[in-house]
């Protein structure tokens, strides 16, 4: 796979996430992240710095949820929903290697957002193979400013 193909693939996932934010009423930010907490694709409303922080926060919350569900033998964590003063944070796994994090406004209808996230995961999950995730990771790493 060439660098140009990697960039095109990354742009496709960025477009899909951006489209999600524009299509789903109340969604303000969205991010696909790897299981190890690295951003893979983000909506245009998420800056590069924010994408890294949101990915790390999401990964940390998922880890806490997994440990809590394991401790009480409740099975795998399927989604996380946090109600914030000015909106919501939602996380849903995309297979075992990635996840979708979404921030919304306070006016967002959670039922609609959760449904749209489920549709997004079902429609894109098959495309996020380990190879594609590795390619996206390389593209994101190459985009980072060097100190």
Name each model feature, range by range:
Residues 2-27, 36-147:
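Acidic, low-complexity cytosolic segments
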């Amino acid at each position: 796979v060439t660098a140009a193909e990697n960039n095109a693939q990354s742009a496709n996932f960025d477009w899909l996430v951006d489209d999600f934010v524009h299509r789903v009423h109340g969604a303000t930010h969205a991010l696909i992240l790897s299981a190890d907490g690295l951003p893979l694709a983000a909506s245009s409303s998420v800056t590069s710095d924010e994408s890294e922080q949101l990915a790390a926060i999401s990964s940390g919350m998922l880890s806490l949820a997994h440990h809590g569900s394991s401790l009480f033998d409740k099975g795998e964590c399927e989604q996380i929903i946090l109600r914030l003063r000015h909106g919501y944070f939602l996380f849903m796994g995309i297979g075992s290697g990635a996840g979708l994090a979404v921030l919304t406004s306070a006016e967002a209808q959670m039922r609609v957002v959760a449904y749209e996230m489920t549709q997004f995961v079902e429609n894109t999950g098959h495309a996020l193979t380990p190879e594609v995730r590795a390619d996206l990771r390389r593209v994101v790493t190459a985009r980072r400013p060097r100190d």
